[in-house]
UniProtKB/Swiss-Prot annotation:
GO terms for biological process: DNA-templated transcription initiation. Keywords: DNA-binding, Repeat, Transcription, Transcription regulation. The lineage of its organism: Archaea, Thermoproteota, Thermoprotei, Sulfolobales, Sulfolobaceae. General factor that plays a role in the activation of archaeal genes transcribed by RNA polymerase. Binds specifically to the TATA box promoter element which lies close to the position of transcription initiation. It comes from the Archaea. GO terms for molecular function: DNA binding; DNA-binding transcription factor activity; general transcription initiation factor activity. InterPro entries: TBP, TBP_archaea, TBP_CS, TBP_dom_sf. Coiled coil: none annotated. This is TATA-box-binding protein. It holds the Pfam family TBP. It comes from Saccharolobus solfataricus (strain ATCC 35092 / DSM 1617 / JCM 11322 / P2). The keyword Repeat applies. Disulfide bonds: none annotated. The gene is tbp.
């Protein structure tokens, strides 16, 4: 079976989305700490207030400037839902919110499994923009320009993708690296017995 016949059947999972949320106002973190349950605020340790949601399982770091860093969402939809719940909770406890929050995704971290074995030595030799030092780290680090992401590629065909700003960039990057690795003859099918061990 030639590598051109290796089928593309990845599994891609979004693991974490980190976003900034901007409110066009300053916030009184002391008042929020006093009125909203289950909030952590210790300005001697950290300048932001820590607000954890259980559903979806997201953490927000809220700063007095009105900026928030929201982390833990597994999709853009879940991120928006979490921000709406945070704003609703703030309003419920008497915190006046002016205008709509501005949400900007800073980083999407995803994992993928190509279901092929990857010859990393060959890939390191043939791919540009990569770093591979197996004595230091077992994965090949590949910097992709379009979309602008970093992929950690392992010989098992598993990978971690960081730096995406949109979910579709993750799928695009995984497809693009698979096609490039197949074109360079760096992938081979996993044998039936190997797949059963997973």
């Amino acid at each position: 079976m030639s590598n051109s016949a290796v089928s593309y059947k990845p599994i891609v999972n979004i693991e974490n989305i980190v976003a900034t949320v901007t409110l066009e106002q300053s916030l009184d973190l002391y008042a929020m700490e006093r009125s909203i349950p289950n909030i952590e605020y210790d300005p001697d340790q950290f300048p932001g207030l820590i607000f954890r949601l259980e559903q979806p399982k997201v953490t927000a770091l809220i700063f007095k400037s009105g900026k928030m860093v929201v982390t833990g969402a597994k999709s853009t939809e879940e991120l928006i839902k979490a921000v709406k719940r945070i704003i609703k909770t703030l309003k419920k406890y008497g915190i006046k919110i002016v205008g709509k929050p501005k949400i900007q995704i800073q980083n999407i971290v995803a994992s993928a499994n190509l279901h092929v074995n990857v010859n990393l030595d060959k890939a390191a030799f043939l791919l540009e923009n990569n770093m591979y030092e197996p004595e230091q780290f077992p994965g090949l680090i590949f910097r992709m320009d379009d979309p602008r992401v970093v992929l950690l590629i392992f010989s098992s065909g598993k990978m971690v993708i960081t730096g995406a700003k949109r979910e579709d960039e993750v799928s695009k990057a995984v497809k693009r690296i698979f096609d490039k690795l197949a074109e360079l003859d760096c992938v081979k099918p996993i044998e039936e017995e190997e797949e059963l061990e997973l």
